[in-house]
Design a protein with these regions (language model features):
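Extracellular/periplasmic carbohydrate-active domains that bind, remodel
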Residues: 1-357
Length: 357
């Protein structure tokens, strides 16, 4: 269907024309036997709806609280969460599948990446929603992804690996044409939205809510992504609101994939440690980012760059533009840390000693 919208103000008229995509099938997930009591495990039923949805179809989740562990979306489908629909994360980590960081191929050359942890391809629990090696995927509606991490042990000793590294609320890997729109994501296990090697990613008009004391619960952390738009997102977290990343030295030097062509516009960045952050995992480089019309409200820092010795000669930051950005109650508007080493491998010999590189 074609639409035209016109807005008039102060004698000026702006017109926007757009077309909505055709929907081949409407899949009501409640027909798969969902139990909306917030306790019953609905993982298999929800996954059945997602897996059987035809190309171009929409999986519709009605209002209700649905307990689930990891769900995997497939290409050319839409997940629609109705207002009042809550996907509630399972609190038992043994119910989540473990994804290997990388799978080797038979030719011993090609590699298939599935997940990562703080810039390295390390085995991690699958996220609540997983968008992995797919294309043309939409998650939309006015519903909620609630990881419910505060009622599990996800925030206890967060730097300690237990079985595998912690999951993300929404994990994306090596995918293309992905859109998140309208939903609320809250109480994440660790980083909330973590796309790795994603091209043409739209994160539009949604909310991220994590408690201020929740450890390592960054809002949005694009890693080695291209053509990302983050527009109209309200982020309330206890760590960095938006952190641009490009892997640590192993992947950064091997793949040389920078994070580039990023637009961040009309976002509220509230209470986090950093408003817009570069790094510290940025061995592939961060390039061509434009930030406009954003409000940083009582973040500890405004624009922060984090890097350190050993990131490699591809760790170049270039083409950053900040325009019409307001900061309120920000303790340190601009910070550059050239020797950042909060994570465990920050104490490695090559970081501490130039001769060890």
């Amino acid at each position: 269907t074609d639409y035209t919208v016109s807005v008039e103000a102060e004698g000026e008229t702006l017109t926007l024309a757009f077309r909505t995509e055709d929907e081949s099938f409407f899949v009501d997930a409640s027909r798969y036997g969902l139990v909306a009591d917030g306790e019953t495990d609905n993982t298999g039923k929800l996954q059945a709806a997602l897996s059987t949805c035809p190309k171009g179809g929409t999986v519709y989740v009605p209002a209700g609280r649905y307990r689930t562990s990891s769900l995997f979306l497939k290409s050319c489908t839409t997940l629609y969460l109705e207002k009042g629909a809550v996907l509630l994360g399972d609190n038992d980590r043994t119910h989540y599948p473990i994804l290997p960081g990388v799978l080797p191929s038979e030719n011993e050359v090609d590699e298939y990446y599935l997940t990562g942890w703080e810039g390295n391809p390390l085995s991690s629990f699958a996220g609540l929603l997983n968008i992995t090696q797919v294309h043309d995927v939409v998650v939309t509606g006015e519903g909620t992804l609630d990881c419910d991490a505060q009622n599990g042990d996800w925030w206890v000793n967060p730097k300690v690996k237990r079985i595998a590294w912690r999951p993300r609320a929404v994990a994306m890997v090596d995918s293309e044409n992905v859109c998140l729109h309208g939903i609320t994501v809250q109480n994440s296990y660790s980083w909330t939205i973590h796309p790795i090697f994603v091209k043409h990613l739209d994160l539009l008009n949604f909310n991220i809510n994590n408690p201020y004391n929740a450890p390592n619960t960054d809002g949005i952390d694009p890693e080695s992504c291209e053509y990302t738009r983050i527009i109209g997102v309200n982020i309330h977290v206890g760590d960095d609101c938006i952190a641009m990343k490009a892997s640590k030295v192993f992947l950064g030097m091997k793949l040389k994939k920078s994070c580039e062509h990023t637009v961040i516009r009309n976002c509220l960045l509230d209470k986090g440690h950093g408003g817009i952050v570069i790094g510290s995992e940025m061995s592939g480089g961060v390039k061509d980012m434009v930030v406009t019309q954003c409000l940083m409200d009582h973040t500890d820092r405004g624009l922060r760059v984090k890097t350190r010795r050993g990131r490699g000669n591809t760790a170049v930051i270039d083409g950053l533009v900040f325009r019409n950005v307001e900061m309120r109650g920000v303790k340190a508007p601009f910070v550059i840390n050239m020797f950042y080493f909060c994570d465990p491998d920050g104490h490695s010999p090559y970081v501490q000693c130039r001769e060890a590189m």
